[in-house]
């Protein structure tokens, strides 16, 4: 199922998901440094593997996907299947509602 068929995302729920499942390795704050994973500020519309100052896997650079609602929705289901060879160890969010909520939060928080 694609993002177009996803339930509406809830920003507050998405923020909770980010804090519990993503914030250990990622930040969304403009100008903040990278953690284990890259800073996600400015994520939407950016090509995978291009955040300045972060050392990406070749897989992430070579994928050359443009991040948006549709690509993130598919990626977050199973990151290792979407980008084989990615350094991201997170197994993914299986529930469509959780992915929609996280994307709603990221869209606001990374802008």
Curated annotation (Swiss-Prot):
InterPro entries, per the entry: Cyt_c-like_dom, Cyt_c-like_dom_sf, Cyt_c_1A/1B
Entry comment on modification after translation: Binds 1 heme c group covalently per subunit.
Superkingdom classification of source: Eukaryota
Pfam families reported for this sequence: Cytochrom_C
Stored Gene3D superfamilies: Cytochrome c-like domain
SUPFAM superfamilies: Cytochrome c (SSF46626)
One cellular component (GO) term of this entry: mitochondrial intermembrane space
N6,N6,N6-trimethyllysine, modified sites: 80, 94
Binding residue positions for heme c: 22, 25-26, 88
Any one Gene Ontology molecular-function term assigned to this protein's record: metal ion binding
This protein's UniProt keywords: Acetylation, Electron transport, Heme, Iron, Metal-binding, Methylation, Mitochondrion, Respiratory chain, Transport
PTM annotation (N-acetylalanine): residues: 1
Keyword Lyase: no
Location within or outside the cell: Mitochondrion intermembrane space
Purpose: Electron carrier protein. The oxidized form of the cytochrome c heme group can accept an electron from the heme group of the cytochrome c1 subunit of cytochrome reductase. Cytochrome c then transfers this electron to the cytochrome oxidase complex, the final protein carrier in the mitochondrial electron-transport chain.
Family classification: Belongs to the cytochrome c family.
More about this protein: The authors placed the amides at positions 24, 70, and 97 by homology with other cytochromes c.
UniProt-recorded name of the protein: Cytochrome c
Organism: Sesamum indicum
């Amino acid at each position: 199922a694609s993002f177009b068929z996803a339930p509406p995302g809830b920003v507050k729920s998405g923020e909770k998901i980010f804090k519990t499942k993503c914030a250990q390795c990622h930040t969304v704050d403009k100008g903040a440094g990278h953690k284990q994973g890259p800073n996600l500020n400015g994520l939407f519309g950016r090509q995978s593997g291009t955040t300045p100052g972060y050392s990406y896997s070749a897989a992430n650079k070579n994928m050359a996907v443009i991040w948006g609602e549709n690509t993130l929705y598919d990626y977050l289901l199973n990151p290792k299947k979407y980008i084989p060879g990615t350094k991201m160890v997170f197994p993914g969010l299986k529930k469509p509602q959780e992915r929609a909520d996280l994307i709603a939060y990221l869209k606001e928080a990374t802008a």
